[in-house]
């Protein structure tokens, strides 16, 4: 036998995707080549470049979401990918929200999971019931959700997401979750006190952080009492303008202070 021949000169090398039979793992999907089929997006288009970036860098969940939103994909694979992050207590963990690591269920991860279910039209029924049972188990005495719950000692977390033993309820997490559940016509006993908390928190903001305003609006956008929500949103709008919490003129960044916890220029 003579020496093995390589590919003919001028032929692009394409690595073979191994079946990974020994480990039992599924083969990794090949990175899609540039679009060449008539009727498909030009490989230089923003969508094609974004798709290639997703295939190169994203988790399976984000790949499935991209396929659902931009390639006519089915919601089933999105939910299957999301289930990998779900725990037996009905919450979600395993770094679904990358700012918190470790397997323990956390309100932040669970809020992220609800956004995914909402995006694919599956935030209801038994899925929502399981999540609400988890939310009930981790709520503070005032019916709200904390940003984090004490997890396993040593689980990594971003410095701006402190994990403490007895965390307070926060509008930052509770507002978006309650608003999303109302928007999907979910009714559960947990929502009654959580909704009351959001009303009280949204209507009492005086010198809010921009993230608090964002969380309040996520609640108010879907709150059942529309006249009350409109009045609260109008008041928040005046606060945002008076306290210059949002940059209205991109050419005049110096006119607005940088929010606490942000670096220079992070308006």
Language-model-detected regions and their locations in the chain:
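Preference for long, amphipathic alpha-helical scaffolds in soluble/luminal domains
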Residues: 15, 20-267
């Amino acid at each position: 036998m003579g020496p093995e021949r390589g590919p003919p000169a001028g032929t692009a090398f394409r690595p073979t995707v191994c079946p990974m039979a020994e480990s039992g793992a599924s083969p990794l999907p090949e990175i899609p080549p540039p679009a060449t089929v008539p009727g498909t997006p030009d490989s230089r288009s923003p969508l094609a470049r974004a798709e290639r970036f997703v295939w190169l860098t994203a988790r399976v969940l984000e790949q499935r979401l991209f396929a659902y939103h931009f390639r006519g994909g089915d919601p089933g694979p999105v939910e299957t990918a999301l289930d990998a992050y779900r725990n037996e207590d009905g919450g979600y963990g395993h770094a679904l929200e990358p700012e918190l690591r470790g397997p323990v269920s956390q309100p932040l991860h669970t809020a992220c999971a609800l956004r995914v279910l909402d995006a694919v039209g599956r935030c209801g029924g038994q899925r929502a019931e399981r999540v609400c049972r988890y939310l009930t188990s981790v709520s503070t005495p005032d019916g709200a959700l904390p940003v984090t719950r004490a997890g396993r000692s040593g689980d990594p977390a971003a410095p701006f997401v402190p994990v403490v033993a007895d965390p307070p309820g926060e509008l930052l997490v509770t507002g978006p979750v309650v608003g999303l559940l109302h928007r999907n016509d979910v009714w559960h006993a947990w929502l009654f006190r959580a909704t009351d908390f959001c009303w009280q928190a949204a209507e009492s903001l005086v010198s809010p952080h921009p993230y608090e305003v964002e969380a309040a609006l996520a609640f108010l956008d879907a709150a059942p009492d529309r006249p009350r929500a409109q009045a609260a949103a109008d008041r928040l709008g005046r606060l945002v303008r008076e306290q210059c919490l949002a940059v209205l003129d991109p050419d005049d960044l110096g006119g607005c202070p940088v929010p606490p916890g942000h670096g220079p220029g992070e308006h």
